UniProtKB/Swiss-Prot annotation:
Pfam family, one: Ribosomal_L13
GO cellular component, one term: cytosolic large ribosomal subunit
Gene designation per UniProt: rplM
Subunit comment: Part of the 50S ribosomal subunit.
Protein name: Large ribosomal subunit protein uL13
HAMAP family linked: Ribosomal_uL13
Alphabetized UniProt keyword annotations: Ribonucleoprotein, Ribosomal protein
Coiled-coil intervals: none
BP term (GO), one: translation
Gene Ontology MF, one: structural constituent of ribosome
Gene3D superfamilies for this protein: Ribosomal protein L13
Native source organism of the sequence: Mesorhizobium japonicum (strain LMG 29417 / CECT 9101 / MAFF 303099)
Family as reported in the entry's similarity comment: Belongs to the universal ribosomal protein uL13 family.
Length: 154
């Protein structure tokens, strides 16, 4: 029996809607990354972009476990000498672009390279409950029901 290899022309992409309210960031990012890559499909091929389009709403209402909300630090460098910058998860979630917490978590779970960058373009993250993709008729994926640990309980 020969190994099945998906052809790019045969790829069928669905639209998936995920409500991130109350979900744990890392567990949510894992589910999103698997859907972006297409690993949930039996036709998964590592070198083909056969993942789905994922829409995430309420990204500003995600939660961290333990003390990560106050202690987790995101670093970046400006490119200038002494230009290391840092912000905590709390500062990011309370800042102008709280959706970046989810974007960065997913970005770091997707392969780094041309295919990973193309797959990340299939991710749309919104801080509020509204999204402009109603015409695509996304099907709702309840991440909290997949595993009880996905949703933080008080």
């Amino acid at each position: 029996m020969t190994t099945f290899s998906q052809k790019p022309a045969d790829v069928v992409k669905k639209w998936i809607l995920i409500d991130a309210e109350g979900l744990v960031v890392g567990r949510l990012a894992t589910v999103i990354a698997n859907h972006l890559r297409g690993k949930h499909k039996p036709t998964f091929t590592p070198h083909v972009d056969d993942g789905d389009n994922v829409i995430v709403i309420n990204a500003d209402k995600v939660v961290f476990t333990g003390k990560k909300f106050t202690d987790k630090v995101y670093y970046w460098h400006t490119g200038h000498p002494g230009g290391i910058k840092e912000r905590t998860a709390r500062q990011l979630l309370e800042g102008r672009f709280p959706e970046r917490v989810v974007e960065k978590a997913v970005e770091r779970m997707v392969p780094r390279g041309p295919l990973g960058r193309r797959q990340m373009k299939n991710l749309r993250v919104y801080a509020g409950a509204e999204h402009p993709h109603v015409a695509q008729q996304p099907e709702v994926l309840d991440v909290a029901k997949l595993n009880s640990k996905n949703k933080k309980v008080a």
